[in-house]
Amino acid sequence: MRLIETTIDIQATASRVWGILSAFSAYPVWNPFIIAAEGEVRPGARLKITIAPPGRRPMTFRPLVLVAVPERELRWLGRLLVPGLFDGEHIFQLEQRDAACCLHHCERFSGILLPLFGDGPLQATRQGFEAMNAALKKRAEAD
């Protein structure tokens, strides 16, 4: 298993941050990493997500929503072809801290193909997470 973890403090409520994270139709306006997202934010829903990691070609996949708790957590599982080949569990967790919200944004990768991917794609994904986090912070903190 490989894990990418990022965290950012946002001077906004968890409610505001959740509102931005769950409004998929606005992603093309502000999100430099997840450039398109479609589907319902509810457990069991199938999403259509297009990511654009820095320096890499965009990729579209159809993950399954595992957890959707407003103002707390959004989690989905994406798979390459069949379970266990290459899986990615993408997690957004929101933690309210007084007037600020801490966003924990991570992904757990697993599967038999994982050793073949090397560090390049995972580094690009980390950079994409950090760019998305910064853009989310900017949008949430705007008046």
What residue spans do the PLM features occupy?
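Hydrophobic ligand-binding cavity/cleft-lining segments
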Residues: 1-42
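Hydrophobic/aromatic beta-strand elements that line small-molecule binding cavities or substrate pockets
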Residues: 6-8, 61-67, 88-96
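Solvent-exposed residues in well-ordered beta-strands and their adjoining turns
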Residues: 9-13, 50-52, 95-97, 106-110
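A short, polar/proline- and glycine-enriched secondary-structure boundary/capping micro-motif
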Residues: 58-60, 85-89, 113-119
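Glycine-rich portal/gate segments that line the openings of hydrophobic small-molecule binding cavities
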Residues: 38-83, 97, 134-143
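A conserved amphipathic terminal alpha-helix motif
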Residues: 102, 108-143
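Polar/charged side chains located within well-ordered beta-strands of beta-rich proteins
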Residues: 63, 76, 90, 104-107
